C-alpha cells in the first residue's frame, strides 16, 4: 500500500514539474515573438534621435538660438535628443 502511494505521489510531482516547465517554455516563446518588433522600434528611436539633433545643429549654424524641435507621440527633445516622456 505504501509503495502505491509513493508511486502515485512521485508521478504527480513529475507531472507538476513537467507542466510548469512547459508553461515556462510557452511564455518564453511568446516573449520572443513579442520582442521581435523591438528592433524595429529601436530603428525608429534612432531616427527620432537623429532628426532632433540635426534640426538643432542647423539652427545653431544660422547664429540663432537653438530651439528644440518638438517630438511627437510621447517624445520630447532634451539635450538635442528625443527622449520618451
Swiss-Prot record:
Cellular compartments annotated: Secreted
Disulphide bridges in this chain?
52-66, 56-77, 71-82
Its primary localisation, in coarse terms, equals secreted
* Range of residues in the leader sequence: 1-22
Q: Does the record's keyword annotation contain Nuclease? A: no
Query: A GO molecular function for this record?
Result: toxin activity
SUPFAM superfamilies attached here?
A: omega toxin-like (SSF57059)
The record ties this protein, via PROSITE patterns, to:
HWTX_2
Q: Which domain of life is it from?
A: Eukaryota
Free-text tissue specificity from the UniProt record:
Expressed by the venom gland.
Keywords in alphabetical order? Disulfide bond, Neurotoxin, Postsynaptic neurotoxin, Secreted, Signal, Toxin
**Pfam families to which the protein is assigned, alphabetical:** Toxin_20
The record ties this protein, via InterPro entries, to:
Hwtx-2-like
What's a GO cellular component annotated to this UniProt protein? host cell postsynaptic membrane
Any chance you could tell me the propeptide residue ranges?
A: 23-48
Q: Give the multimer and partner information.
A: Monomer.
Which family does this protein fall into? Belongs to the neurotoxin 12 (Hwtx-2) family. 02 (Hwtx-2) subfamily.
Q: What does the record give as the function of this protein?
A: Neurotoxin active on both insects and mammals.
Task: Spell out the protein name for this chain.
Answer: U4-theraphotoxin-Hhn1a
Q: Which organism is it from?
A: Cyriopagopus hainanus (Chinese bird spider)
